[in-house]
Amino acid sequence: MLVQNNKNQCKDNNLLHVSHFVGLSGVGGVQRNFVEYINSRTVLESDSSFFHKIYTLGSVDSQYKLKKEVFDIKRLTNLLSLILDITSRNKIVHFYNNLTSIKVVIFLFLLPVHNLILHERGVIWNLPYFRRPLLLFVIWKARLVLTNSNATKIMLEKKFNITSKKVRVIHNGINTKVKCTKKKLLHDKSSIFHIGFIGRLDTPKGVHVLIEAMRHLVGKNIELVIAGDGILEYFLKKQAKDYKNISFIGRVENPYRFLSSIELLVVPSIREPLGNVCLEAGLCRIPVLAANIDGIPEIIENKVTGELINATDRISIYMPEGAVPLPNFVVNPTNQQLQIPRQINPLLLARKILELSEKPALLEYYAENLHSKVMDYFNIDRFSSELHAVYREINTSKSITHKIDN
């Protein structure tokens, strides 16, 4: 892990101090988005009005090359430092995906909290309703709750009857300076059409549906490459063992290298608060075929930046111990209401993959439109700008409140 600890910034009392508490031991959209933000030019170079300090619990995954020091609160001195930051009137503390944590509830109950931001990115899908009082307490303690999508905000509002004006949407952004060179792939009838999936091999991702779809595509010059690992890996490999058109390559360190080697990304999710992988595909000009569920349509506009398939089938998946449970509800993006989770019909998915494999011009159209959308809106600079505006807003309001109290 690279470490860049700017001691001069610590000494400058004019800087707005922001402490981040985020889990960095796992692999997911929360971690990738945070690392890209904290390593961005806006944070490291351009914007000298902030001092950022990072806290975590446990180890940092080797995939994340952070350019700032990370403080593990398993060490007592670091835990005490975080507590002092939380109780300070002069510092903002930003928690990521901790809205449903019992430990956080206890933590906040015991401490006076002044400038806390909670960033919710999807864990509430599986939060039982009986824990609503705890959720309300945590939101009450916070100055603001940020969500990564309108779908996440809707889940808070519809499932838990949260109508707080504290909830605000800031869509994720990615580093658009990353080089992602798409392979020059052949489109003649004899060439193989490469499709891919990348992500955790767990219940919400719906990979079992994609494998079943490939059963209908045997002999069609279409091959699926699955990148990722997880608790369902053994069972998915068992499901796919008789299909020579499917290969598993395990977890990849560089998702852009993987994306640049395929012609179509398939996202068959059962639950997906936003879908960061769609943004990464867009940067690489890789078209996306995805489930029309939750926050995915906030990135993929059907027939414009990709294609969406409605999830209509009852879910049939083996659930080993330790797998992420299915949520009680997901967000229907068409009517903005909650519905029982469903999966894509495998035969319908197979037909759509086959259809798109025969339309390279259409895929190119989707890819260019998605690329433009990512470059224009879903970029890390826009994300940073909106987030820093929130920090300044809280800093201004806390200064006014402090003067009134005095």
What are these regions (language model features)?
Residues 2-7, 16-79, 230, 390:
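N-terminal strand-loop element at the rim of the active site
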Residues 18-21, 187-205, 210-214, 337:
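Conserved donor-binding/catalytic core segment of Leloir-type glycosyltransferases
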Residues 28-36, 197-216, 231-234:
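A conserved mid-protein helix/loop that constitutes part of the nucleotide-sugar donor-binding site
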Residues 87, 117-146, 154, 161-162:
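A conserved, positively charged/aromatic
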Residues 95-102, 120-123:
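Short His-centered aromatic/hydrophobic patch
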Residues 151, 173:
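Carbohydrate-associated surface elements
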Residues 251, 270:
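Aromatic "clamp/platform" in nucleotide-sugar-dependent glycosyltransferases that forms part
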Residues 287-290, 300, 307-309:
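Short hydrophobic beta-strand element within catalytic cores of glycosyltransferases
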